Amino acid sequence: MHLAFIIDDYLPDSTRVGSKMLHELALNFIANGHQVTVITPSVNHQSNSLDVIQIDEVSVWRFANGPVKDVGKVKRAINETLMSFNAWRSISSKVTKDTFDGIVYYSPSVFFGPLVKKIKNKCECNAYLILRDIFPQWAIDAGIISTKSL
């Protein structure tokens, strides 16, 4: 099975916990015989619209996009709004019906919705959203679990 992992920042440029967790998940899938391609924006101003690199055994497709981390709100909003457009423009020539068997994408970036939809339609596959920041406090506040369950 070939999975596309989509996240708004990734190793080695990111030290954020989300990128580390997704990398560990990718390595686990690879250890179980699957193939993983991470699709992520470049944090550096790259000259190519798409750079393909390997990190450990994970294929990483970095597309050119403006910064979305550690920048002002207006700049971040513009760059996040353009993420799906920039990603699809960069990867569309590499994505065929048989490229991916599934998509795993990491919240909270709602701006990947159009990209996920395009890949799902092209590859006729399912997508799975990894929700974060809902446990434990959100679940307690919503009354789903009690503070004693932690």
Predicted regions and their residues:
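An aromatic- and histidine-rich active-site surface loop
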Residues: 84-91, 100-125, 129-132, 137
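A conserved catalytic-core segment of Leloir-type glycosyltransferases
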Residues: 39-94
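Short, glycine/serine-rich, charged loops/turns that create anion-binding
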Residues: 10-11, 43, 67, 110, ...
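A conditional alpha-helix N-cap/helix-loop micro-motif detector
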Residues: 18-19, 80-84, 150
